[in-house]
Amino acid sequence: GRRIRVLRVQVIQEQTDGRRLWELYLGTGADITTDPAKAIDILDIPNDGEAATRTFLRDEGPRGERDEALSGRWLGTPPTTVHKIIVEYTEES
C-alpha cells in the first residue's frame, strides 16, 4: 500500500448556498473528533466563494498511514448545491 501526503485542499462553492463548514481529516472516523491527532483542517466556505488549507511544502504536509483514507465531512446542514473539492497530494511508499 501507499501513503498519501496532503499538499493542499481547496473547496469551491460556485452558487449561492450559504456559509458552510467542511472538516478534513485522515482515517475513516465519523468526524474530526474521532481521532484529533489525524485532524487536518476545518474550512470555512463563504457563501458563493472558496477556501483552502494552507499549502504544505513537499514532505511536510499531513501524512496518512498505509492505505489510510482522506475523509471530508460537512458540519451542520449539508449544502444543496454542487461544490468542487480539489485535493493535491503526493504518494509515498
Predicted regions and their residues:
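Short, surface-exposed beta-strand/strand-loop-strand elements in extracellular ectodomains
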Residues: 16-36
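A detector of low-complexity, intrinsically disordered, Ser/Thr/Gly/Pro/Ala-rich segments
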Residues: 26, 31, 51-53, 88
